[in-house]
Amino acid sequence: MRHILYLAFALFCLTGHAQESAEANTLVANVEGTAAIERSRTLNFTEMGQPNGVRLSGINRFVDLNSGIRLDELVTRANLSLRVLYPQGMRHDQSFVRVYVNNQLSGISQLSVARAGVPHTINIELDPLLFSDFATVRIEYDGTYDSECVDPGNPTLRLDMRPESTLTIGSTPLNLVNDLALLPAPFFDPRDN
């Protein structure tokens, strides 16, 4: 009787192992069989809550922009394209724009003296690994006009970002596991913009 129980238990374990390996092979075949299609989404400042653009200064040094990433997407690339204008009177060798994604530094751009007073575009590549379901992109202005003492209220310290500035996010779809706890995803995702 004991031998029959051992045999039944061994067969039960083997069938479970065979089912798991068959499912794993099916998932791998599905992943390898389909090419990952990258989806690109571009949001301008108006769509991210800044319809009039943003003016950063020595007092108001940063702005937060929010974007949602769907549960069934993986961010593969991100680019911030800022349409900016800043005055000529500041020290451009000591003035920067820093970009944080979810409170992690992702990019820095020094302000150019050659482009001061002229509207132009600053492109900053962002680290896609820093993006999560709700992503906060913080743009911080660090400007100075004097190497010794700086008055943060000085009108020379300003950076104007136009509303046509954009955040472009490239993503690939992810296969979600069959779990009712994820509902209403993927049919409805509150992070859709």
Positions of PLM-derived features:
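Sec-dependent signal peptide recognition
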Residues: 2-7
